Curated annotation (Swiss-Prot):
Record GO cellular component, one term: extracellular region
GO MF terms, alphabetically ordered: ion channel inhibitor activity; toxin activity
S-S bonds: 50-67, 57-71, 66-75
Subcellular location: Secreted
Annotated region (Disordered), positions in chain: 25-44
Keyword Signal: yes
The protein, known as: Conotoxin Cl6.2
Domain characteristics, as noted in the entry: The presence of a 'disulfide through disulfide knot' structurally defines this protein as a knottin.
Length: 76
């Protein structure tokens, strides 16, 4: 019986804490993550280090180093 009362009180306290936290956060985030604001964008092809079109990249494989997705001795 005592254990049941302790568990009920603990659940009520935790529920009250959740409601208090939810009410305090209604004003919005003070410091939102950069990814949610769009500040973290993928670098464009000119900003990243890549092999330009018509330059040697290797033999018969998909090269991540090419600015274009196709590599057959040279980047296409």
């Amino acid at each position: 019986m005592k254990l049941t009362c302790v568990l009920i009180v603990a659940v009520l306290v935790l529920t009250a804490c959740q409601f208090t936290a939810a009410i305090d956060s209604r004003g919005g985030q003070e410091n939102p993550a950069p990814r949610s604001t769009g500040l973290m964008r993928r670098k464009s092809q000119t900003e990243r280090n890549c092999i330009p079109k018509n330059h040697f990249c290797g033999l018969l494989h998909h090269s991540r180093n090419c600015c274009t997705p196709t590599c057959l001795i040279v980047c296409f």
